[in-house]
Amino acid sequence: MIQFVVDETKCTQCGQCVRDCVAKIIKQGDAGVPHVQAEDEARCIRCQHCLAVCPAAAVSIFGLAPSNSVPLKDDSFPSLGDMISLVRGRRSVRQYRDENVSPDLLRQLLEVLGNVPTGVNRMALTFSVIDDREAMRRFRDKAYRLIAEAVKAGSLPEHTLSYFQGAAEAWRERGEDIVFRGAPHLLIVSASPDSACPQEDVALALAYFELTAQCAGLGTVWCGLMKWAMESVPALKEEAGLPPDHSYYAMLFGLPAVHYPRTVQRDGAGHIRRIQA
């Protein structure tokens, strides 16, 4: 049961919920009040657009009342200039302070991930986080030990052997953390294989997390080396507790130990191609 309910004392019969329903299951009968037939409920993709679009706050669904939603005003979103500055000013951070992100901030960042877009609104994402620097230290130590064991056993793919051999030696001999960059936290987003587009869902979630985290003053970096290591050393993926059939990617984050007072300069316009229909 999707519990689609319309408060008839508020409903103006404007039809916006009908027009915006992607599954086209909301209908207006002779009385003009929107409704959903029981046999159509299985087609609902649970997007809640009907609740969000109703100007009179007359629609509730899944037992969720519109009064509990966040009101959106003209100035609720960042300005275009703010977004351009954020995208241009976002940097991959590879220097971190040896401190935990505050639990309250981390909670906010993780909770908002429930709002990231996913294909067909499947929302089949798992967010695996290391939220404490001591836990990260232990995970880092285990990761380098597993990498070193794989190097010694000769079980690494040839194209990764020299790189991870160097990374393991740098950690063992100099304490240089090439893979995790000394970050106190790690987020791995994974998607189940029954997702409509698992790889895209994972990338979108991390992109949203990155921009939100950097707005909160945190540093982030996409950890392709972590994924490379997990693919080369399966025991490391098991150590992270990831389901074996999930698509995944990782991001390091924490309080930055570096500040960038200006953007870099890139000419992206040269890569724009207009399609002439």
What residues fall within each predicted segment?
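Small-aliphatic-rich amphipathic alpha-helix that forms the alpha element of a beta-alpha
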Residues: T12, L109, L113, H185-L187, ...
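Iron-sulfur cluster-binding cysteine motifs and their immediate structural context
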Residues: Q16-H35, H49-P66
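C-terminal helix-cap and adjacent tail motif
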Residues: S76, E173-R174, P244-A277
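Extended interfacial segments that mediate partner engagement and assembly in macromolecular machines
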Residues: P71-G114
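Glycine-rich, charged/polar anion/phosphate-binding loops
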Residues: V112-G114, A170-G175, P234-E238, A257-Y260
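Short gly/pro-enriched beta-turn/loop segments at secondary-structure junctions
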Residues: R122-M123, F180-P184, C215
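Short microdomains enriched in Cys/His and/or Lys/Arg
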Residues: V36-V53, S69-R88
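Glycine/small-residue-rich phosphate/adenosyl-binding loop
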Residues: V129-E200
